[in-house]
């Protein structure tokens, strides 16, 4: 199931009425977001194909032939759900991302913001990442409760992810943030901005959120060559801001197929989403790479209709089960309730049947599955070797797969070890064999260390502790992992 969220451009109400806003106009109160936020070094991720070795020590030699392969969906999940939020909306951060990752959530109920001219004025209040860091939050913010996700089939949490579109050519993505803890005379600093800034993009990407092109600043949006040119301009800005990271997805804006035509000719864009003229995604039929394929999505504002679609696809025979592909312009309290409902029914607090990644992560996994290979061999009576080959394409950042190995059970295993190409590893029984989750991200240990360090700065922050445990939990067993866990306790 794919969900997409889209945004409408707004008047910039950020600064409000300067005469009434005494706190926060001083430049000393502002943070330049791009100077503050850590980002996983995507630009220095593994280059070139990956060949990973897994070594399984067993009690006795297997009595049946061993077979290995990658399932259609990661973690052997039977249901695919994808969420894409268009137009670079601020709510992607302070609502969608926040709700998934156990952070305070921006309340969409209007809050009193009276002025002399408008004593009954109300407004929805939002926050930025700089506000969250400093504890400067709207007065009606919804408190952090829990994280939302599923498991990897071995008991480890895998939080939901989604895609946000970027407006990379817009200057407002570089906007400063007015941070003023304790100031309550007015709340202009929490009024909705034009969109996300790069600070929020970086923080969300650290948690698995994907990015996509959307509108570009072409004068003629019906000119393929001009749109291609602006893809390049936007891509350069993205690389500059995101440590060399590129964007490989397009969410078609405004029903304009010229963007699709331009994307087909623009090398970096590999996966697309559209409301029409695309292909429905049937994950259990996908035998090709889906490269340069525009996947159909739909916009649905009635949450009950989305629930009905999820129920219908969950009941459908596997081969006929579609990914539910939904677009939405803005997320509010009702959308947060929908995410919680998905978690409670199909996630880790339900039947644990859903895989909820970003579209680009799904695209990569399907590419690895259809173009990579797994070789299994018994090197001696007590050792089985798995060799996993992953072909790395341009702009690939999620080298992580599930491998099923039949003919062997967890109870038969003495130990599982891997070579240095593997940074994360977990396994468990699955059907008539075992499943192994193999992560080959180059900087996964450094990434986990960052979140441990964030927790060490404030050990009273329960959400930061949950983050530290979550990211350290991704690592394969090692002395380094043990040392990081000891720092959290």
Predicted features along the sequence, with ranges:
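Active-site beta->alpha N-cap acidic-glycine motif
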Residues: 46-203, 207, 237, 246-247, ...
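Solvent-exposed loop/turn segments at secondary-structure junctions
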Residues: 87-91, 168-173, 211, 215-221, ...
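CE4/NodB-like, metal-dependent polysaccharide N-deacetylase domain
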Residues: 145-151, 161, 209-210, 215-219, ...
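C-terminal beta-strand-rich structural cap/linker in extracellular carbohydrate-active enzymes
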Residues: 394, 425-447
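Beta-rich interaction/scaffold domains
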Residues: 443-489
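Catalytic domains of cell-wall/extracellular-matrix polysaccharide-remodeling enzymes
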Residues: 217-299, 334
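C-terminal domain-boundary segment and adjacent tail
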Residues: 57-58, 64-65, 107-118, 269-284, ...
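Bacterial Sec-dependent N-terminal signal peptides
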Residues: 4-46
